[in-house]
């Protein structure tokens, strides 16, 4: 339901088929009007989040090829990125996830440079994604996957598609929310400082 915002999926099951300790309800409605943004917000309900707003959006292309939807926020837990290509779950990531990491990292570093935050020079994609909770869904004509299970997207064009779609919206989101952007940047820089400190301790 969350891959198709606005769609209402109604589930029902004969109660006699459910086991005694099964949490599966006999009836349920799955409806996320805001798509990935609503689903991500619901899944993180009650969790500490660095920014008040989830960064989310859509890019729709005529014919569907190159269309995508995304939602990401940063929180106090371990980062995760749930990605899909043509509604197929890509559990092992791939080129679309690479584009997502690239554009978020470059956007934050560009904002840091714009605001004179020199501490962000050490930030890399690991620091940006280590506490990011994200969802990404892309639609690509004739996608290429690694292996038969389609767990990893290999279409090189997906990197450019994702980067081009998200670059400007992310830049605008950061610029329109300077207090939130500063909090996020400080949070990511702190993750980078931790990474550098751990590396130095090992050396």
Go through the PLM ranges and name each one.
Residues 1-203:
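GHKL-family ATPase ATP-binding module
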């Amino acid at each position: 339901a969350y891959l198709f915002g606005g769609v209402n999926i109604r589930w029902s099951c004969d109660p006699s088929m459910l086991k005694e300790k099964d949490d599966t309800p006999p009836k349920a409605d799955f409806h996320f009007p805001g798509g990935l943004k609503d689903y991500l917000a619901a899944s993180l309900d009650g969790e500490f989040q660095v920014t008040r707003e989830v960064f989310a959006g859509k890019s729709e292309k005529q014919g569907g090829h190159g269309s995508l939807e995304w939602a990401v926020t940063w929180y106090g837990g371990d980062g995760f990125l749930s990605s899909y290509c043509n509604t197929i779950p890509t559990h092992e990531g791939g080129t679309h996830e690479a584009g997502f990491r690239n554009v978020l990292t470059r956007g934050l570093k560009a904002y840091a440079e714009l605001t004179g935050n020199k501490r962000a020079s050490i930030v890399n994609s690991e620091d940006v994604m280590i506490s990011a909770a994200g969802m990404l869904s892309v639609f690509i004509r004739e996608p290429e996957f690694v292996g038969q299970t389609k767990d990893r997207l290999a279409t090189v064009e997906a990197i450019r598609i994702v980067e081009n779609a998200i670059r400007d919206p992310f830049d605008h989101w950061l610029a329109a929310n300077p207090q939130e952007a500063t909090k996020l940047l400080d949070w990511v820089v702190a993750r980078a400082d931790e990474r550098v400190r751990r590396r130095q301790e090992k050396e």
